Amino acid sequence: MAERSQHLQDVFLNTVRKQKISLTIFLVNGVKLTGIVTSFDNFCVLLRRDGHAQLVYKHAISTIMPGQPVQMFEGESSE
């Protein structure tokens, strides 16, 4: 069976989704969003905060900052 390569953004988003890590997302227009990733696909990220959901298109995202260190790969030390 062919092995599917994983993109870094998919590994990162899936890790913060599973661990429910709060994120700060900056958009290209300067808007700052905070919340927890509940789902994502190739084109967008579903962000939840205070019971409200926001669908954010990836092409509008400039920077993503997690609220705590993220260990994406086994054996990786979090410093």
Curated annotation (Swiss-Prot):
Q: Which Pfam families match?
A: Hfq
Fetch the PROSITE patterns from UniProt.
Answer: SM (PS52002)
Gene3D superfamilies this protein is in? 2.30.30.100
Instruction: Give the Sm domain ranges.
Output: 10-70
- List the keywords (alphabetical): RNA-binding, Stress response
**Keyword ATP-binding attributed:** no
Q: Name one GO biological process term.
A: regulation of RNA stability
Q: Name any GO cellular component annotation.
A: cytosol
Molecular function via GO:
RNA binding
Record-linked CDD domains:
Hfq (cd01716)
Family under the similarity heading: Belongs to the Hfq family.
Quaternary organization: Homohexamer.
What NCBIfam families is this protein classified in?
Answer: Hfq, PRK00395.1
Tell me, in a sentence or two, what this protein's role is: RNA chaperone that binds small regulatory RNA (sRNAs) and mRNAs to facilitate mRNA translational regulation in response to envelope stress, environmental stress and changes in metabolite concentrations. Also binds with high specificity to tRNAs.
Q: What is this protein called?
A: RNA-binding protein Hfq
User: Which species does this protein come from?
Assistant: Bartonella quintana (strain Toulouse)
Q: Which gene encodes it?
A: hfq
